[in-house]
From Swiss-Prot:
Belongs to the V-ATPase D subunit family. The keyword Transcription does not apply. PANTHER family: V-TYPE ATP SYNTHASE SUBUNIT D (PTHR11671). Produces ATP from ADP in the presence of a proton gradient across the membrane. One of its GO terms (molecular function) is ATP binding. The keyword RNA-binding does not apply. It comes from the Bacteria. The lineage of its organism: Bacteria, Bacillati, Bacillota, Clostridia, Eubacteriales. InterPro entries: V_ATPase_D. Gene3D superfamilies: 1.10.287.3240. GO terms for biological process: proton motive force-driven plasma membrane ATP synthesis. This is V-type ATP synthase subunit D.
Amino acid sequence: MKLNVNPTRMELTKLKKRLTTATRGHKLLKDKQDELMRRFIGMIKKNNELRKDVEKELEGSFKDFLMASAVMSPEFLEEAVAYPKESISVDVKKQNIMSVNVPVFDFKRKLEGDKGSIFPYGFANTSAELDGAIEKLYGILPKLLELAKVEKACQLMADEIEKTRRRVNALEYMTIPQLEETIRFIQMKLDENERSTVTRLMKIKSMMEEKQSNMV
């Protein structure tokens, strides 16, 4: 559907400039979309690999925890893990990836007391299985934190890809076709007006020549 504009040469010039800008913008956005997709696929691959590793390691920790719960009373087990020995602080920064502000988490881990022991309990009334579960969870934590960062980055990039896709489609299927159709319409009207003007001038010339001939 063409735009509702006056078919003048000035309007034609404006529309041609708009078409050039829209075409250039479409190419830039399409390039951005392609690069975002390339990076997104890489992030998804990394996310899947991390999640697979984390789930596998968590499974081992949960098995140890279940074995510990079989030989320890629920009350004492809950008390043993109620007060974690490690504190974690997060410093959040941002990294710009193709106009996407991806969070970069800097985690600081600190063990409290007991010369850095990771166990929040004494060993007298606990089982080796509980020790194993705590050790595994402690070792998994860096991957869990990295997984959180990667998953958030994937989510933000997916949102940006969708926004870019909508803008590309709007230019490709609406704005550019409308401009092209309107330009063709104005050009056609200008050509018609020019032919009409030429025909009218030729008639006037013919009438003047005929008049001069009759006067002689």
